[in-house]
């Protein structure tokens, strides 16, 4: 029995609320159970210096956690004067994931910056950030098109992410903190809406796990991503 009472192949209660911020070109509050991440997309009509003149755009991301998003307060990284390795890893992952489904030539020389702020953390913050950021990115690009500054569809597919793990030897979908902190193995899967693999991050926490167990995790992830993509579509439909 999972701590939450969920079936092994069940996601947490997922809510993707688009248009959450009135200022950003695109935004989405992604709620994966008790994990809440605000994702905003901002359009900058310039690209990094190393890309100028190349005729291509760029999509990048920043990630951060509010001091009391966790059980005990954590100092802001700005107060420490540097980002942690974990923060840098996660924001690079978010950027890579979104670029994998964006036709950078079609958007022209603009940069879209995704800001992912964890309001409350209960496991799976990076997966919530990726899933919500895609919704925010889509919104921003749609608004860009309406202004006559670009042409859709620069997004080639959906992208979403979910975690899976082995808890007491059983493969389970979408780990919360209680499961993630005790899992024998866990993995984050970033997949496209058509089933393409963008990135898989997997770790054995106690002892190696078998290939057959990994395939169980992958099958769960594929099921979860299918459901998340359906929620992304529903979120965008609610804006029309």
UniProtKB/Swiss-Prot annotation:
Q: Which residues form the signal peptide?
A: none
Q: What is its EC number?
A: 2.7.7.56
What Gene3D superfamilies has UniProt attached to this entry?
A: GHMP Kinase, N-terminal domain
Annotated transmembrane regions: none
Where on this chain does phosphate bind? 86, 124-126
Q: Which enzyme class?
A: transferase
Which superkingdom, per the lineage? Bacteria
What is a biological process (GO) this protein takes part in? Answer: rRNA catabolic process
Entry's Pfam families?
A: RNase_PH, RNase_PH_C
Q: Which UniProt keywords apply?
A: Nucleotidyltransferase, RNA-binding, rRNA processing, Transferase, tRNA processing, tRNA-binding
Catalytic activity annotation = tRNA(n+1) + phosphate = tRNA(n) + a ribonucleoside 5'-diphosphate
Instruction: Kindly list the GO molecular function terms attached to this UniProt entry.
Output: 3'-5'-RNA exonuclease activity; tRNA binding; tRNA nucleotidyltransferase activity
**Record carries keyword RNA-binding:** yes
Report the protein's function: Phosphorolytic 3'-5' exoribonuclease that plays an important role in tRNA 3'-end maturation. Removes nucleotide residues following the 3'-CCA terminus of tRNAs; can also add nucleotides to the ends of RNA molecules by using nucleoside diphosphates as substrates, but this may not be physiologically important. Probably plays a role in initiation of 16S rRNA degradation (leading to ribosome degradation) during starvation.
Query: Hey, which family's this protein in?
Result: Belongs to the RNase PH family.
Q: How does it assemble?
A: Homohexameric ring arranged as a trimer of dimers.
Q: What is this protein called?
A: Ribonuclease PH
Source taxonomy: Bacteria, Pseudomonadati, Pseudomonadota, Alphaproteobacteria, Rhodospirillales
Gene that encodes it: rph
């Amino acid at each position: 029995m999972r701590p939450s009472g969920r079936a092994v192949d069940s996601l947490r209660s997922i809510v993707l609320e688009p248009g959450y911020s009135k200022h950003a070109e695109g935004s989405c509050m992604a709620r994966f159970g008790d994990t809440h991440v605000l994702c905003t997309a901002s359009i900058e009509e310039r690209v990094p210096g190393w890309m100028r003149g190349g005729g291509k755009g760029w999509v990048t991301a920043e990630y951060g956690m509010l001091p009391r998003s966790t059980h005990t307060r954590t100092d802001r990284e700005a107060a420490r004067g540097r980002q942690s390795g974990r923060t840098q890893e996660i924001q690079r992952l978010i950027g890579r994931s979104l670029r994998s489904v964006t036709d950078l030539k079609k958007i022209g020389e603009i940069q879209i910056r995704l800001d992912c702020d964890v309001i409350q953390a209960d496991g799976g913050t990076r997966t919530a950030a990726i899933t919500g950021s895609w919704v925010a990115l889509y919104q921003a690009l749609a608004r860009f098109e309406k202004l006559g500054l670009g042409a859709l569809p620069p997004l080639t597919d959906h992208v979403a992410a979910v975690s899976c793990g082995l808890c007491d030897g059983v493969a389970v979908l979408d780990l919360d903190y209680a499961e993630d902190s005790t899992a024998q193995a866990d993995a984050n899967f970033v997949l496209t809406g058509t089933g393409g693999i963008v990135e898989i991050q997997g770790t054995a926490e106690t002892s190696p796990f078998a290939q057959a167990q990994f395939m169980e995790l992958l099958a769960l992830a594929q099921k979860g991503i299918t459901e998340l993509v359906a929620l992304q579509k529903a979120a965008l439909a609610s804006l029309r």
